[in-house]
């Protein structure tokens, strides 16, 4: 390819498709080690300047072979349950492990406390049920709060402050719980909120005002305040200065240690999904290229969110001479990646490169329809690639029955 694309999702490639990518099997994920390191350095610099602590939210990126690139700059990992907590403890040893779950299982708590340093509960009932044992085990105990402050538009599925949300405790819920159990506040070491999704720091400032209004009287008695995730800190144009002011405000006003747990920011624009064209069909006015990669299986957020992932050297439909619809090979009628403006309709066998594919892909993919899991490769700063892991029939089969 002689095309160039210097948009952020493809900047790690230098704006071109390196020849060595043509040699990789498709579909495959390619993680860019240099981009991961740069993201981690930005987050580490924030921590150094402000004294906050930054955690990797493993729900977005959990390719632990790359953890050594991140660990020098981060305080640890954030987990959503037992398995992620164990992964963080094993693969980022010596670092903090924080865990939050909407509801914990009683039969997992004994093992969970072996790995976790901070355990955050979602409700007063779970705090009362498991908090005493967590405290007795020497863990720092927190409660996720719901400041009832929505700052998102159009993505209710990702809004923890949406009406009727199951995530976090409102002030009214907390007051009722304390009235019934006055000893409940004695279990708390910190508060946690997570209300953002791919947002700038102005949304955090708005949320922090709501936290101060609803829960400000509790915070001086806390050791820490966790700002959660959804902060697009490593995105070009992100207002880091405002974020630093928010952190300093919390530290000075309430005397707390501030934690942040970004997921996307750790691996933003640090990965690619490589795919090849299997067939090109024409249905009326619609040109459709069927790929060996599936939206449903290999980039499920495309359907779930939904969104259209960036494609190298492509534009909006109608902005280039041709418009093509890219779709997966599964039997799902809706296995469609999106419509793109391109210079020419791709040919069978052509390599296509999707950007920003390190996040919410390898940790969410699946084998629906018997689709193979893509291999995972890593690309060093020198441009050399190495295989991390590949998958085969056994990985599909043994999720479904006995070995």
Placement of each model-derived feature along the sequence:
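Extended, folded domain segments that form the structural surfaces/walls around functional sites
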Residues: 200-220, 232-258
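Active-site-proximal beta-alpha core segment in soluble small-molecule metabolic enzymes
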Residues: 52-224
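N-terminal capping/small domains of soluble enzymes
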Residues: 5, 9-94, 100-104, 108, ...
